[in-house]
Regions:
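A short, small-residue-rich loop immediately preceding and capping a beta-strand
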Residues: 8-21, 39, 156-162
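Glycine-rich phosphate-binding loop signature in dinucleotide/nucleotide-binding domains
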Residues: 3-8, 152-154
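Phosphate/ATP-binding catalytic cores across multiple sugar-kinase/actin-like superfamilies
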Residues: 1-3, 147-148
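Glycine/aspartate-rich loop-and-adjacent alpha/beta segment that forms the canonical ThDP
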Residues: 160-179
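C-terminal structured "cap/appendage" subdomains that terminate the fold
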Residues: 127-161
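Active-site nucleophile and cofactor-binding loops and adjacent substrate-binding regions
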Residues: 13-18, 43, 113-115, 132-140, ...
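Short glycine/serine/threonine-rich phosphate/pyrophosphate-binding segments
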Residues: 15-26, 49-51, 138-145, 167-170
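Active-site/ligand-binding loops adjacent to catalytic centers
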Residues: 2-6, 31-36, 41-132, 175-179
Length: 179
């Protein structure tokens, strides 16, 4: 309602672990043309120096069964669930909701990942320049926004769902950033 009409180019960026906050954020926009409203999900890429991650969609995992549902999973060749690693407890999960598998397979949403280091850098930038205190989950989404913003036209609007407060991440932030 602020714009009186939907702008022509919008990027809706959300972190994706299990996927409920992303789908809730995107659900009103699913039927819009993807050239007008792009849905971008950002998974936990884990530490840069580790092979472990929690990014089954963006790291081309295979379909498997977890909790009775078929979805892309971090798994080994025998179908056993792999360990995952992420600075963000809320994103440290080996699977994703089947709705995100559908959105990926139909190319309605694009999925990527941010490393722990990317998320920490984004957290610091957002905290300093926007006076927000995002949790580590949306810091992954902010990392993607920071990465793509310089390449976008000036009429493109980026909206990041900041779906959590850093109070719960206080100990991790103190350990990693000395704050």
């Amino acid at each position: 309602s602020q714009f009186k009409k939907i702008p022509n180019k919008i990027k809706l960026i959300n972190c994706v672990g299990g996927g409920s906050s992303a789908y809730g954020f995107w659900s009103e926009f699913i039927d819009y043309n993807k050239k007008q409203i792009e849905l971008i999900g950002v998974e936990a890429g884990g530490p840069k120096k580790s092979k472990l991650h929690a990014a089954p969609l963006s790291k081309n995992a295979k379909i498997g069964i977890l909790h009775g549902a078929a979805s892309y999973l971090c798994q080994n060749k025998e179908g056993q669930i792999n360990d995952t690693e992420s600075i963000s407890a809320g994103l440290d999960y080996p699977g994703v909701s089947p709705i995100h598998c559908f959105l990926k397979d139909t190319k309605r949403a694009r999925y990527t990942y941010a490393t722990d280091e990317d998320a920490l850098n984004a957290y610091q930038l957002v905290t300093k320049h926007e006076n927000l205190n995002p949790s580590l989950e949306p810091s992954h989404a902010f990392a993607e926004a920071i990465k793509i913003a310089p390449r976008l036209s000036k009429d493109t609007i980026i909206i990041v769902n900041s779906c959590g407060d850093a109070k719960k991440d206080r100990d991790i932030l103190r350990e990693r950033l000395g704050k």
